[in-house]
Amino acid sequence: MPLKLIDLFCGAGGFSRGFKDEGFDVVLGVDNMPQVAESFKANFLEAQVLVEDIQQLRSEDVVDPLVGDVDVVIGSPPCEPFTGANPRRRPNPLDRLYDDPQGRLVLHFIRLVGDLKPKVFVMENVPALAEGPLREALKREFARVGYPNVYFNLLRAEDYGTPSHRLRLFISNARIKPPASGRKVTVIEAIGDLPPPSSPHDIPNHELIPLSPRKQKRISKLRWGEALIRYAGAEGKIYHNYVRLHPYRLAPTVMGSSRFVHPFEDRLLTVREQARLMGFPDNHVFRGGRDLQFDQVGEAVPPPLARAIAREVKRWLFKSGFG
């Protein structure tokens, strides 16, 4: 019998995609945005989908009426309170968890894990979620709901076949250290076989993005690796956007706000090309307006990394006698 999985903060389902591809039964996704939930439903037709604020969600709303007992709970609470890319991040790390309204969503994830009592949970976020006193605070919170042994697993998506850099933290009651897959996948290997978006095709989310003549002229002058926009994140760190991608290297980290310039053409990448940089298959679709589609791509767990994690979770469950 397949292992049952619930995805909290499911987004478009990148995290769930990896588990589904590894044979898990994705029974429920929860997201508070209706159009994002539509994306999830379009990709997981047999799953239930709840459009719900997780702060209002109780385990009894989920377990008996919808899915029964669950084996695995995964989720990606918003990273904005913790990421260094947010210039308005609170200076005190504990304030990010306990006082920031979005940061407190992590605590609601922990609450639901305690109520649902899965055999394994995996929570994804930026590495800064565990910096300073936050690591010990999170250990205490998980211990309080019945999980005294918690592992802070740092993984790089590019080690598992994702064509872009991405260092992320996966907090779990299982140790997750999948072996790296080997050779890295470059930008041109990821997107080079796609037809021009202006040509006839039937590839979803692969539409040309209009640019003003002024912006078109400016990006035409960019060389590989150069950026049109620079901005300051938390503590003055500089970030770049509208980067012309180097075709023979990995792409930079894909964020919801990221827009990339094609290596050889004076245009922005389409949503589909950006999804390719995250390892999404072309049959994984994104609903809503274009900016929301980009958000869904950039906020996802890359499916190749998710599948490597799913493989480790399955191994841990069998080793622990649950499989």
Where are these regions (language model features)?
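Class I S-adenosyl-L-methionine
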Residues: E60-V70, E80-N241
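C-terminal target-recognition/interaction regions appended to catalytic cores
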Residues: H206-G323
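Class I SAM-dependent methyltransferase "Motif I" SAM/SAH-binding loop
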Residues: F9-C10
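Short, conserved SAM-binding/catalytic segment
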Residues: F40-V49
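Short beta-strand element of Class I
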Residues: V26-V27
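Conserved SAM/SAH-binding beta-strand->alpha-helix loop
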Residues: M33
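Conserved SAM/SAH-binding loop
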Residues: E52-L57, L155
